[in-house]
Amino acid sequence: MIDTIQYLLGPIERLCCLSKRQVLPVEIDDTTSALFELQSGITGTIGTLFATPSNSLLRIYGTGGLIEAKNEFSEVSFQGDGELYENILIQPSNTLTAEFSGFCDACEGHEAYPVSADEAIRNVAIIEAMSSSSKQMGEWMNISGLLKKGAV
């Protein structure tokens, strides 16, 4: 979801996060909540729950309406100010298979991988910042600062 948010709205600049194990019997965090601010000043939240059935939901609110993508992004809805939802159905695809196929194509020199090295590094920096923030009781983390320090 981090890469999708940045692709659509721009780079995440800073974030704070709480993450902990609440339900699962294995020693991994199963509940995570993060508040973030993009370089543009837009704010948002990311939440993950590994102890629930798999589900992906992206909802973007704006002054002129909202857009929502759900059911593994195969269903997109838009609602303008005071309007009914407009639903768009997209043919579902296995995104993991597509990702591996794209990686193989890039390795074989057929096509460039759709995610640049800089984008991948920034995505990892954000995940690392979420982990660090949670370990420091939700302290705000500056992503550009982490990248400049080479912390990732």
Summary of predicted features, one role per range:
Residues 1-4, 56, 99-102:
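Hydrophobic alpha-helical segments typical of transmembrane helices
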Residues 1-43, 49-53, 118:
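Rossmann-like dinucleotide-binding domain that binds NAD(P)(H)
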Residues 54-55, 61, 67-71, 98:
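C-terminal substrate-binding/catalytic lobe of Rossmann-fold NAD(P)-dependent oxidoreductases
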Residues 89-101:
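Active-site loop of classical SDR/Rossmann-like NAD(P)-dependent oxidoreductases
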